[in-house]
């Protein structure tokens, strides 16, 4: 609705002025679309801004915060306390513990030395106890028992007769059994410490008797005697408690002595010291000593 104001003017041109004003007012409402466009431009610019909010999507960062949680869970700080608990300081005390064991082994070697030296001083005083008449008589019985023939007809050499003692069917004669009992009884009456030198004197007496006798059967002893003395008796000067033996006779003493030492304790059930040897106090020398 348009209102017109009428003024009293003589000319009617004034009526046209309001008509000019209306078209001037008409473009004015056309300007507001610019105003509408102006706000529309910033608003769509501001709208993508909230659309660009991937930043709330960054709450994944707390998921990434689990990595620092894994850092304390890492075993590396656990290994760090393990390193101060290294076994190297534990091995260091083990080494000083092993070192006292070496001085412990040294006294063992020191104890073993007197043990090996003990039988030698024991044999020397025991060899001095041999000259008693009763012991010589007892040893002569054992010597006769070892040299006696234990078969019916044939006379067995020394080595064969000693080995035959292990065979029960060979010893059949009563005389052999009687002398065996006498020898075992008399050997049991001797002190245990003096049994070893007693057996040594038996061995020496047997070997010396084989050297003197010429009516010995064929065997190892007779062949050795023929090579040494050509069938002639060998006389050696003998001191009380000590007998001189030729170097060539050591093999003979070793064979006879080992057999006697093995057979007599088994036959008589008598204990003999383990350090007993067939040589004992017998010294090596030449025929003129």
From Swiss-Prot:
Q: What keyword terms does UniProt attach to this protein?
A: Cytoplasm, Seed storage protein, Storage protein, Vacuole
Q: Which family would the database say this protein is a member of? A: Belongs to the gliadin/glutenin family.
Q: Which domain of life is it from?
A: Eukaryota
UniProt feature, compositional bias: Pro residues: 41-59
Q: What is this protein called?
A: Gamma-hordein-3
- Where in the body, by tissue, does this protein show up? Developing endosperm.
Q: Which Pfam families match?
A: Gliadin
Secretion signal, residue range per the UniProt entry: none
**Location(s), subcellular:** Cytoplasm; Vacuole
Tell me the GO molecular function terms: nutrient reservoir activity
Give the InterPro entries listed for this entry.
Answer: Bifun_inhib/LTP/seed_sf, Bifunc_inhib/LTP/seed_store, Glia_glutenin
Q: Where is this region: Disordered?
A: 1-132
**One CC-aspect GO term:** vacuole
Indicate yes or no for the key word Cytoplasm: yes
Claim: Nuclease is one of the keywords in the record: no
Locations of Polar residues compositional bias?
Answer: 1-10
Q: Which PANTHER family does the protein's record reference?
A: DELTA GLIADIN-D1 (PTHR33454:SF8), PROLAMIN PPROL 14P (PTHR33454)
Question: In UniProt terms, what function does this protein have?
Answer: Has a role in the transport and targeting of prolamins to the vacuole of developing barley endosperm.
| This protein's domain notes | Sulfur-rich hordein which possesses an N-terminal half composed of proline-glutamine blocks organized in repeating units and a C-terminal half where the repeats are dispersed and less conserved.
Instruction: Identify the species of origin.
Output: Hordeum vulgare
Which ranges are annotated Low complexity under compositional bias? Answer: 18-40, 60-131
